[in-house]
Amino acid sequence: MEIQNDQWVSAFLLYLKMEKNHSPHTIVNYELDLRHFRDFMEQQSIPSFAAVSYAFVRHYLTVLYEQEYARSTVSRKLSTLRSFYQFLVREKWVMENPFLLAHTPKGVKKLPSFLYEEEMEQLLDALNGDSPLQLRNRALFETIYASGLRVSECCGLKLQDVDLSIGTVFVFGKGRKERYVPIGSFACDAIQEYIENGREKLLKKSKSVDLPGDLFLNYRGGPLTERGVRKILHQALDQAALSTRVSPHSLRHSFATHLLNNGADLRVVQDLLGHENLSTTQVYTHVTKDRLRDVYRTHHPRA
């Protein structure tokens, strides 16, 4: 049974990669959720995925809540297992999907964190200097704010993906989907200065035989990582004397929020962000409504 379980998981992960075009990061998360469920099965003496019943699924969810897992985490695990069993049913390895009727209670949707326009200006203004790392940091955050790229997308940019003559970047995004995103003159200027006066100096520190073609490099001349971007942002927030604690992804939220605040069409923002569904983008309309309400209460004499 152990061998069969391993084979089914491997087949599912291959399906996610080859047919669903999921990113390696997403596939790893699926694998971790499946491993967690298998560990629970072993604790409960359930020998195989085929032996899982709806009653066992309810027991599993109850234990997750008793262990105080976040609602979002439970929801993600449930989604993973529902998709896994849907695949097993498709392959005719099991007769039915025990997760089909399992649901988590709906919670209050958390609004995305973002910086106000004044805070964003304060952050970017603090990124001055002409050292290679300072030039890189300025170009990095100007690019994310100008384009709304995910941090993973920004770290994945190659030199040839950026066309400064027309102000666009080519993005290989989530689900292996490709899109072109415009960037403004501030980002173009920052990238140009970084390429001319910073990147080559960082590249010389690389000990690799095959020099990376990545646009953004770390202090050793290798590709900049998402973890590295988080560290740089925290340092930049301190440098800008901003007490707001936000993540690099919050700059993407800021991009979308500021566009909508200034009258951009929701579907245009959807395309720029690379969202497959409009409902994913609509969360930003709640943010802008809150912003409008704050402005009204602050400035209207009879608010």
Curated annotation (Swiss-Prot):
Residues 3-89 form the Core-binding (CB) domain. Keywords: Cell cycle, Cell division, Chromosome partition, Cytoplasm, DNA integration, DNA recombination, DNA-binding. The active site is at R150, K174, H249, R252, H275, Y284 (o-(3'-phospho-dna)-tyrosine intermediate). GO terms for biological process: cell division; chromosome segregation; DNA transposition. Residues 110-297 form the Tyr recombinase domain. GO terms for cellular component: cytoplasm. This is Tyrosine recombinase XerC. The lineage of its organism: Bacteria, Bacillati, Bacillota, Bacilli, Bacillales.
